[in-house]
Every structure is written in structure tokens, then in C-alpha cells.
């Protein structure tokens, strides 16, 4: 069983990393393998709606998105962490997630998702809601904890002082581990839920 964690901060070892690393420790204690990928300062462009991924099975731009895609397919759970910029996620991370979720043809049903956000002060819940949209449109159950998954601090040292925030991360990791293991047992016993043929409609005809 494996969890992929994406650090969407340009700072490799900052506040977002502090939150994700706290989760990593609990995952490992629970027997769950982890891999942490840092977006860092990689120049990741947004989707240009070319449709090339529908023919190729991968994004036409060969960058970190296509490196992460097979890791995403192989994992049982995905944790996405972001700093808060203007009550929103880091734009580089959003570009990565837009292309990652749209270009990958594999079924994401019942992979467990969780989002983690860090800020000096405000904008956390708006960013948290934004990131969860990627999971809820993809048939991915969303793991929750004892509070919204956030940590406060202006740097990693301050984030380490947010004792409640760190506890939230540990609780989230325990709940996510339980949910992934429960889903695995369910898949072994019952299989995945039946899917109807997809129906698409537009508001304007």
C-alpha cells in the first residue's frame, strides 16, 4: 500500500513540507509506503486544451506532470499540499494538477485523496476546498481529520510550533491509512462499484 505526497510549494523544506513530513511519519508507522514529490521551482505550464493527451495517453508537454503520472496510477492514496496565495493554491501546483488529472486515462475510482494547506494567517479553507475539487470529480473518497487540514506559520520553524496543526496532520494520516486499508478489503471482497456508461450534456444545445 502506497501514498504519493505532492509538495506544491516552491520551498522544498518549508511549511508545506513540515505538514506533509508529519503525515509521512504516521504513514510509515502504519505500514504504508510513501513517496514525496516536490514541485519546487519547476516551470510548469498550464493546459492549452489541445486534446493531444486523448490521442497520446499522456500530456504533450514532457515535464514533471508526466513523471508523476505513473506514480499516481500506482498509488492507493494521494496527498496534495499547497501554500496559500491570495486565498488560493499555488498557481504552479494548479497547472500541474489540471494537466495531471485531465491527461491521465487510468481510473482513479476509490484512490483516497487528501489536501493539506499552509498559511501565515488566512485563506486556508478556500484553498482546501479548491484542492478537494480534483478528488471529488474523479471518484476519489476524501480523507478527513479532526479539523480542516491546515497548518500555520511563516516558515518551517514556526510551523513546528503549531502543535494543533501537527496533530491535525497525524490524525489525517491515521484516518487516511484506515480508509485505504478498508477500501482495499472492500475491493477484494466486492470489487469496485459498477459504472454506468458516461452521459454528457451541455447547458446550451
For each of these PLM feature ranges, what is it?
Residues 25-32, 77, 101-105, 133-140, ...:
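Generic secondary-structure signature for well-ordered alpha-helical cores
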Amino acid at each position: 500500500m502506497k501514498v504519493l505526497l505532492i509538495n506544491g510549494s516552491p520551498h522544498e523544506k518549508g511549511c508545506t513540507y513540515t505538514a506533509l513530513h508529519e503525515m509521512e511519519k504516521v504513514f510509515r508507522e502504519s505500514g504504508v509506503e510513501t513517496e514525496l514529490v516536490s514541485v519546487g521551482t519547476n516551470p510548469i505550464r498550464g493546459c492549452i486544451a489541445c486534446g493531444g493527451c486523448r490521442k497520446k495517453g499522456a500530456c504533450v508537454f514532457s515535464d514533471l506532470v508526466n513523471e508523476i503520472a505513473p506514480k499516481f496510477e500506482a498509488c492507493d492514496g494521494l496527498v496534495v499540499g499547497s501554500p496559500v496565495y491570495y486565498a488560493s493554491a499555488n498557481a504552479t501546483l494548479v497547472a500541474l494538477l489540471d494537466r495531471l488529472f485531465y491527461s491521465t486515462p487510468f481510473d482513479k475510482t476509490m484512490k483516497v485523496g487528501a489536501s493539506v494547506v499552509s498559511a501565515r494567517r488566512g485563506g486556508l479553507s478556500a484553498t482546501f476546498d479548491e484542492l478537494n475539487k480534483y478528488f471529488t470529480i474523479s471518484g476519489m473518497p476524501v480523507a478527513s481529520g479532526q479539523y480542516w487540514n491546515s497548518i500555520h506559520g511563516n516558515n518551517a520553524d514556526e510551523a513546528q510550533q503549531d502543535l494543533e496543526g501537527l496533530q491535525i496532520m497525524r490524525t489525517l494520516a491515521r484516518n487516511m491509512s484506515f480508509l485505504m486499508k478498508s477500501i482495499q478489503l472492500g475491493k477484494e471482497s466486492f470489487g469496485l462499484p459498477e459504472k454506468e456508461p458516461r452521459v454528457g450534456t451541455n447547458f446550451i444545445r
